[in-house]
Amino acid sequence: MKKLLLILFGLIIINPAQLIAGDKEDIIKQLLANNAYAKKNNQTADEYSANGALEFWSSGGLMQKIEPAGRPDKYDYMKIDFKHIEVIVLVPKKAAVAMYYSEGSMKPEGAPAVSHYLTRVTQGLVKEGGTWKIRASHWSPVSGGSGTTQTTLN
């Protein structure tokens, strides 16, 4: 048994990338699937942690506490694409950070349309029940683009 543990430990040291194999790809696939859902259904997917999340939004304003049910975002239309997604795995199979650009146009229900939405996104993700969930987000407008006008959930 001791020999087996030493061999396994040695393999991990020699090839630590095996530990994170698939996490990056799974996260990118899930982010794109959640975005496709939002575009098709004009509302966001179930993507938040059971512990909720903290967020800074592209509109500026103060930090927002998001409940586990997520943000109740609904849109008259939503034509946003995620681009240049990069993932940093912090703890294999448990925690990661995703960074990407969110670009397009949208009209949230009850709010003005945003014709050139262009933001940088950083999200802290945790794996819950086999699915990567949002635990923290920071959205900041890129020069020449704009964020939303929403500053609170209420």
Question: Each PLM stretch: what is its role?
Answer:
Residues 34, 44-46, 53, 68, ...:
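Hydrophobic pocket/interface hotspot
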Residues 48-64, 71-77, 109:
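A short gly/proline-enriched turn/hairpin at secondary-structure junctions
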Residues 118-147:
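Short beta-strand edge/turn micro-motifs at domain boundaries
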Residues 15-51, 148-154:
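Short, low-complexity N-terminal intrinsically disordered segments enriched in polar/charged residues
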Residues 69-113:
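Surface-exposed, charged secondary-structure patches
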Residues 4-15:
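Sec-dependent N-terminal signal peptides
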Residues 52-53, 61-62, 103-106, 140-144:
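Solvent-exposed loop/turn segments at secondary-structure junctions
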Residues 110-115, 144-150:
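A short acidic/glycine-rich loop-to-helix N-cap element
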